[in-house]
Curated annotation (Swiss-Prot):
It holds the Pfam family TilS_C. One of its GO terms (molecular function) is tRNA(Ile)-lysidine synthase activity. This is tRNA(Ile)-lysidine synthase. It catalyses: cytidine(34) in tRNA(Ile2) + L-lysine + ATP = lysidine(34) in tRNA(Ile2) + AMP + diphosphate + H(+). It comes from Francisella tularensis subsp. novicida (strain U112). Belongs to the tRNA(Ile)-lysidine synthase family. It is an enzyme of class 6 (ligase). Keywords: ATP-binding, Cytoplasm, Ligase, Nucleotide-binding, tRNA processing. Its main location: cytoplasm. One of its GO terms (cellular component) is cytoplasm. The keyword Hydrolase does not apply. The gene is tilS. It comes from the Bacteria. The lineage of its organism: Bacteria, Pseudomonadati, Pseudomonadota, Gammaproteobacteria, Thiotrichales.
Length: 398
């Protein structure tokens, strides 16, 4: 199937965007998308994100800028900082790119972000998610269209293969850059693209199309499931709380799915399989006062007949600044603020006070250090990598 320029243009037009933002890397996918989209009578902004990883990244930026000048289009470049230690570059960079796109989209009434993902990207994503053991939502892969906080993101080339995109570029004399880092198999996606997909093509020459179709089926099935679960969730909820006696009337699998959906809707975060199992066990043997930590930010409590999410305590900027300043003075090491979490004290919090071999509950330490009860309420727990490293403004742990 060859790319139909008119179909792609009509697909974009049906969203009636006030402005079009294109993620433009200079690669063949985004170059073809830019070439097609420039024919629309809609203000268009091309954005180049410089990841500062490749020796030629500045050359690519200049290529993109010159192409936009030739097309008479607005061009914006943005340079990413160094990825924080311990974070996946791919996941971090994806978040950074989307955050910048949203920043550019913010002033416009109905902006539409266009990205050049294609069928081969979808096939690779399906395999990545399958390897992770993902469920329907993960296997659904890359969405064709998705609402964003402001505007939406559309991938008009998602049904076309990489070969079809390259053929379009050749027929239309579209110049583009080639990123040789795509051959580096230390990245999982490159390993799948360059080594696993070719093996699968020996079994099924149309493996890209087949896996993409499977992703679409998963997406459709997941949409149906989410609609049905959302309706059921509304019937067993009171405000943002879950009514336990109503939830446990349902089949176990439905209970677990509703627990996942309930938490996702209220926090925009996902529960891990282990956490869902713990929650499921707890609601079927409910005990008032039971609680579970879900990351450093959230707790889930059972209070009488309801399951309740405890949200993070808001610490104003001045208080946080004071806490970080205190930590810097008392902790003899460099602090990576991206890994620091500050929260209120919990009953079971423990700290290994300096010079001791094992941790003690904070209540015991407060008593031993003769910290007045009236002062203890001021305590803020400082965590790094989910470990308590200090109790502000009293002492350092570890």
């Amino acid at each position: 199937m060859s790319i139909s320029k008119s179909l792609v243009l009509n697909e974009i037009k049906k969203f009636s965007p006030s402005h079009i933002i294109i993620g433009y890397s200079g690669g063949v996918d985004s170059s073809v998308l830019l070439n097609i989209s420039k024919e629309l009578d809609i203000p268009l902004i091309a954005i180049y994100i410089n990841h500062n990883l490749h020796r030629d990244s500045l050359k690519w930026q200049i290529h993109c800028q010159q192409t936009c000048q030739r097309y008479n289009l607005q061009f914006i470049s943005h340079s990413l900082d160094k990825v924080p230690k311990g974070e996946s570059f791919e996941a971090w960079a994806s978040k950074q790119r989307m955050a910048f796109f949203q920043k550019i989209m913010q002033p416009y009434s109905k902006p539409l972000l266009l990205l050049g993902h294609h069928q081969d990207d979808q096939a690779e994503t399906f395999l990545i998610q399958a390897i992770r053991g993902s469920g329907l939502a993960g296997l659904a892969g890359i969405p064709h269209y998705k609402e964003l906080h402001h505007g939406g993101v559309l991938r008009p080339l998602l049904k076309y293969s990489k070969i079809e995109i390259e053929e379009f570029a050749k027929l239309n004399n579209i110049s583009y850059i080639y990123d040789d880092s795509n051959e580096d198999i230390k990245y999982r996606r490159n390993l799948i693209r360059n080594q696993i997909i070719p093996i699968l093509q020996q079994v099924n020459p149309n493996i890209g199309q087949t896996l993409s179709r499977s992703a679409n089926i998963c997406a459709e099935s997941n949409n149906i499931l989410q609609k049905l679960l959302t309706e059921r969730l509304q019937s067993i909820s009171q405000d943002t709380n879950l009514i336990i006696s109503e939830l446990i009337k349902l089949d176990d699998d439905i209970q677990k799915s509703l627990l996942h959906l309930w938490f996702k809707q209220n926090t925009q975060q996902s529960l891990k399989s282990k956490q869902i199992k713990e929650l499921h066990l707890a609601i079927n043997n409910p005990s008032t006062g039971w609680q579970i930590d879900i990351s450093n930010y959230y707790q889930i409590h059972i209070q009488y007949n309801q399951l309740i999410i405890k949200y993070p305590t808001t610490i104003n900027d001045m208080s946080k600044e004071d806490i970080i300043s205190w930590l810097s003075k008392n902790l003899n090491e460099e602090i990576d603020l991206t890994k620091i979490v500050i929260r209120d004290r919990k009953p079971d919090d423990k700290c290994k006070y300096r010079g001791r071999n094992k941790p003690n509950k904070l209540k015991i330490l407060f008593q031993e250090l003769q910290i007045p009860t009236t002062e203890r309420s001021k305590a803020k727990i400082i965590l790094k990598d989910q470990q308590i490293i200090a109790v502000y403004p009293f002492f350092i742990c570890g």
